[in-house]
Amino acid sequence: MENSPDSPQPLELGVAAGRVSPPEGRRRGGREAEDGPAGRAVDSGGQGAAAAAARSSLGDPTSPSQLGCGAGSDLKDGASSSPAASEVPSRGQHKVTASPELAEAAAGRGSGPVGDTGTCRVEQAAEEPSSTGAPSSSCSEPSPPGDSPSLDSLESFSNLHSFPSSSEFNSEEGAETRVPEDVEEGAAGPPRAAPLCKEEEEDPAQVLAASKERFPGQSVYHIKWIQWKEENTPIITQNENGPCPLLAILNVLLLAWKVKLPPMMEIITAEQLMEYLGDYMLEAKPKEISEIQRVNYEQNMSDAMAILHKLQTGLDVNVRFTGVRVFEYTPECIVFDLLDIPLYHGWLVDPQIDDIVKAVGNCSYNQLVEKIISCKQSDNSQLVSEGFVAEQFLNNTATQLTYHGLCELTSTVQEGELCVFFRNNHFSTMTKYKGQLYLLVTDQGFLTEEKIVWESLHNVDGDGNFCDSEFHLRPPSDPETVYKGQQDQIDQDYLMALSLQQEQQSQEINWEQIPEGISDLELAKKLQEEEDRRASQYYQEQEQAQAVVTTTTPSTQAQQGQPAQASPSSIKQPGNSERKRKEPREKDKEKEKEKNSCVIL
């Protein structure tokens, strides 16, 4: 057969060995479908069918390390068993393992044999129609040299390695005979994030360990489920306090219900987040636009894909001090434009301070730093003064938020708007509720705190109030949950420790060695410590004396009660006891008379 642009081309060794990742197959499918004469595969959904047909023809990978199309293992096993079993079935056939009858039928249809170990040739029947314009296999022929890369097919995802496939989260048994359901049912939609379907059935700890083994060096994030507008909604928490715009963007899409995760999913990897984001960017492509708008959109998509991997670490955002939405134009800002997510900052110059306005002007942050360096080296005193004022402005607003900027943010952000806020080189999800700005709490330390979802942004110091998902202030701990006896014991222990500490400090003070130049404050502190020590010692002595009295009183009463207990007749003869009570009284009266008589003498 003569090689023509439409005829299949020989596969490379890397393809036969199973080193082609699913995103490459997806990119090639999108590129050929868009540039081909059959129409746009992305718009019509042919890309998903092509990817599904590719998976059905080559089988799912059977090990975590085998992330490609998996053709190498099938061809090697087929070559060792029978020559006919190494044939690659054409599109439309769902079984992967080739029986002798299937091999004979394939040989009768004219499928090409396998050549050397380095290359293989896949030929399909000329009479088979192609309704969708998508390639018949993920291991398809390379694009012609004159082809321009399609910008809506995730062309720049090569630096993200390969996304996890669904077989990595399923059992390895029966991987060769599994038939994708989307091929049988004729599903034509774009591929969704399949690897997350089994998360809800597996132990999160096992999934976390498996994810770290399969994707070494990748970040794993925990998911917190909240009740957002009466809907069970997930948000991604952050394990490290670093610049991570990926989480801020995904949380905006999750709160807006534009991206959905499987129910009760608890962990997710960074690569899976990138896959969700890439799928949404493809779905959000405008359908009916003019040719000029389409070219502009494709250029923006190309620029966004080139920096998409930076979302995991940080974006180079260069703010201007004149407006809350004024940034220097960089490719990093195109991502927010494509996703239609507003990006704000609050690092503004107060227009009422003329010298700062004159020193800063319309400079961006990078330009202002360069201006400060040049002004310091200048011989002009006016330039030196401007550089000093600009440097003071940066030092005084190190939190990257001013009160003027906070006021502008409050008036600019729309009610209920979900956006991304840039401050302290960190990206946060922000919204506005009843005229008050709130930042989404994504710290992993609050993963189990269901009542802590938002934090108010009402000053530049960063000491906001925590609120729940309905923007109610977090109530204090329930008094019933605090054990009173335990709290009393804690208070007593604290007072005892404080008393012992004060006593020890007072004993260490040597009043004879007090320097003459001691200040009044230090002398007053020492006197107060001595007074506290004496007071505590006095109270301790009082308590000990009271304890001695309480212990001696029962003993004396017991000694007085022994004679009464010794005579059993005292109980039966009440008259005798009355006489005994009267006798001491009479003796006391006689003594008083004797005293009085002595006084008269």
UniProtKB/Swiss-Prot annotation:
Residues 1-205, 534-601 are annotated as: Disordered. PANTHER family: NF-E2 INDUCIBLE PROTEIN (PTHR18063), UBIQUITIN CARBOXYL-TERMINAL HYDROLASE MINDY-2 (PTHR18063:SF8). GO terms for biological process: proteolysis. The active site is at C244, H426. Belongs to the MINDY deubiquitinase family. FAM63 subfamily. Hydrolase that can remove 'Lys-48'-linked conjugated ubiquitin from proteins. Can also bind to polyubiquitin chains of different linkage types, including 'Lys-6', 'Lys-11', 'Lys-29', 'Lys-33' and 'Lys-63'. May play a regulatory role at the level of protein turnover. GO terms for molecular function: cysteine-type carboxypeptidase activity; cysteine-type deubiquitinase activity; K11-linked polyubiquitin modification-dependent protein binding; K48-linked deubiquitinase activity; K48-linked polyubiquitin modification-dependent protein binding; K6-linked polyubiquitin modification-dependent protein binding; K63-linked polyubiquitin modification-dependent protein binding. Residues 127-141, 148-169, 186-195, 536-570 have a biased composition (Low complexity). The record marks D520, L523, A524, L527 as: Ubiquitin-binding. This is Ubiquitin carboxyl-terminal hydrolase MINDY-2. The modification Phosphothreonine is found at T62. Residues 24-34, 577-601 have a biased composition (Basic and acidic residues). The modification Phosphoserine is found at S82. It catalyses: Thiol-dependent hydrolysis of ester, thioester, amide, peptide and isopeptide bonds formed by the C-terminal Gly of ubiquitin (a 76-residue protein attached to proteins as an intracellular targeting signal). One of its GO terms (cellular component) is nucleoplasm. Its EC number is 3.4.19.12. It comes from Mus musculus. InterPro entries: MINDY (IPR007518), MINDY_domain (IPR033979). Residues 485-537 are annotated as: Ubiquitin-binding domain (UBD). Keywords: Hydrolase, Phosphoprotein, Protease, Thiol protease, Ubl conjugation pathway.
